[in-house]
Amino acid sequence: ALYILMIVFVVYTIIKNNKFWSWGAAATIISQVASYLPIALGIGGCIVLTGTDLSAGRVVGLTAAVSAILLQRADLPNRIMGAFPELPAGAAIVLAILATMVVGGIVGFINGFFVAKFKLHPFIVTLATQLMTYSVILLVFMLGGNNGQPMNGLRPEYTNFVKGTMVEIGGAALPWYVLYAVIFAVLMWFIWNKTTFGKNMFAVGSNQEAASVSGVNVFKTIVMVHTLAGIMYGLNGFIEAARLRSVNQA
């Protein structure tokens, strides 16, 4: 019934607005979906474990701030890392990607550890880490005399790497981060469906006791799922900072 309603809605919209079914509209929809696909892939693993992750948005915000700090232009008067020399664009981008993955992975590891070790519900654990992560964000925005101001002035190499035009179809541009989102989706599909870790994840999500009896390391699996989710949030933060060209505390 839901699919029928969706089809009816799409057909009605096309009839009432002929611009809905256009390359421009399709490119906009694809770009919007791709910009949030990494965070969805991360939370997907947590949902398979019959849990959730309320800290996802804040981790994206924190890692976006990390990306902005590392990739601000050197000529900015209020550059947070003003005392440090500007790295070559390629090296700075790689460093930012690694930094966001590490920061996101650490938060994810903390989530997974407390969920697995103390048998706490993910809702409670991730609510706590959400608040703690936001506190860290507020502190980060006070660094270098920034005084809580939005971080902008990002290097053009960074924004082009993420938001530059990958291809034009019918006059509508698709940015590079659409390709990155597809790569992440394929990678996560492979991990979930073609690896022992993925099979263990589904086993733990179905029945932890049965999985444990079958020889699955439940603790390790839960921690790894949340850590992987955190890494995906970090990559989403890297994309989001460049996509918006600015990062704020919200």
Regions inferred by a protein language model and the residue ranges of each:
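Interfacial loop-to-helix junctions that mark the boundaries of transmembrane helices
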Residues: W23-S31, A83-V94, G164-V178, V247-A250
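Single transmembrane alpha-helix segments in multi-pass membrane proteins
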Residues: V10-I14, W23-R79, F113-L120, A210
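Transmembrane helix-bundle core of multi-pass membrane transporters
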Residues: P122-T195, T221-M224, R243-Q249
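Membrane-interface helix caps of multi-pass small-molecule transporters
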Residues: G45, I69, I106-K117, V140, ...
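Alpha-helical transmembrane segments within multi-pass membrane transporters and channels
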Residues: P77-Q130
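Helix-loop-helix "hairpin" substructures at the membrane interface of multi-pass membrane proteins
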Residues: A92-T100, V107-N111, G170-V247
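Structural signal for alpha-helical transmembrane segments and their membrane-water exit/capping regions
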Residues: L5-W21, L49, I137-F141, M188-T196
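Helix-loop-helix hairpins and the membrane-proximal interhelical loops
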Residues: A1-A34, F238, A242-N248
